[in-house]
Amino acid sequence: MRVLAAMSGGVDSSVAAARMVDAGHDVVGVHLALSTAPGTLRTGSRGCCSKEDASDARRVADVLGIPFYVWDFAEKFQADVIDEFLSAYARGETPNPCVTCNQKIKFSALSAKAVALGFDAVATGHYARLSGGRLRRAVDKDKDQSYVLAVLSAEQLRHAAFPIGDTPKPQIREEAARRGLAVAEKPDSHDICFIPSGNTRAFLGERIGVRRGAVVDADGTVLAEHDGVHGFTIGQRKGLGIAGPGPDGRPRYVTAIDADTATVRVGEASDLDVREMLGRAVVFTSGTAPSGPFECAVQVRAHGETADAVAELVGDELVVRLRAPLRGVAPGQTLALYRRDPDGDEVLGSATIAGTSR
């Protein structure tokens, strides 16, 4: 099998590439250049997508004895990931750019180019498992990345390979060291790769600009003014610009954002509880939608807990009714659907949260 190994320069993708070589596949390594603008992406070992990371990936490819290329995806990354990230926050939503990158860059643009060049699969260092076309959680629950892959279609998964999903992260580092890979102890990246400072609020403010509005309580009383709804997300407690807790002494949280009126509403923690979610841009990883209501477990954050629910496709929207309230759900978040399984929860699909109700 001809395999294109996506190599970020980190330990996970390096071991993934090595395992594909060991399996006897015809492997070619590729690093994605996602920006040419100074200061746009992280540099050094703290993040991904830098020149240093490209060099690390090349050195690993040399050790493995495979061809290596750097492909320029900067323009598409800007349009499909960064610009959409900015637009979503301007709409008062809370997107996950890693989800968007997987859906539109790694397993769409990159995968399409790979297939056009005669490759059978794109292998990445994601912590997830594929078995019989079914996407499952990784063995290492703490590192599991199935959530950010739940947006992938059956066709996208058909050309994907996740060689390290059956191994805990500490063992991946040990394996890299045994193989003599210099990235064995390279730190993991945790922040958004295109925000060098790690300050998302400042990044958004510089690019979206000022659109002043009001912070109000449940009664509509104006508590403060703000410079733009992009500085807030549902469940936020700090940085609200208001003078301390409510009259009853309880902390106040962002409970709703109206981008049309630039209004941010705050309330108590209990106001964050939701029992129903509405999803758009629905994807079922099998390629076939269930014919009626179905039991599932849902997850709304990359490393969040799952909650039992009943979901149903109504037209082109997904209605999800929770068995118990879920707190702090924000429009724009990815809603991943799972089928519980002791051998590793299976991903059923996903949707983008369009609205919630209590």
From Swiss-Prot:
UniProt name for this protein = tRNA-specific 2-thiouridylase MnmA
Would you identify the family this protein belongs to, as annotated? Belongs to the MnmA/TRMU family.
Would you tell me the Gene Ontology cellular component terms?
A: cytoplasm
GO MF term (any one): tRNA binding
What are the protein's UniProt keywords? Answer: ATP-binding, Cytoplasm, Disulfide bond, Nucleotide-binding, RNA-binding, Transferase, tRNA processing, tRNA-binding
Q: Where is this region: Interaction with tRNA?
A: 143-145
Tell me the gene name: mnmA
- The residues the record assigns to binding ATP are A6, M7, S8, G9, G10, V11, D12, S13, L32, G125
Q: Name one GO biological process term.
A: tRNA wobble position uridine thiolation
Catalytic reaction equation(s)? S-sulfanyl-L-cysteinyl-[protein] + uridine(34) in tRNA + AH2 + ATP = 2-thiouridine(34) in tRNA + L-cysteinyl-[protein] + A + AMP + diphosphate + H(+)
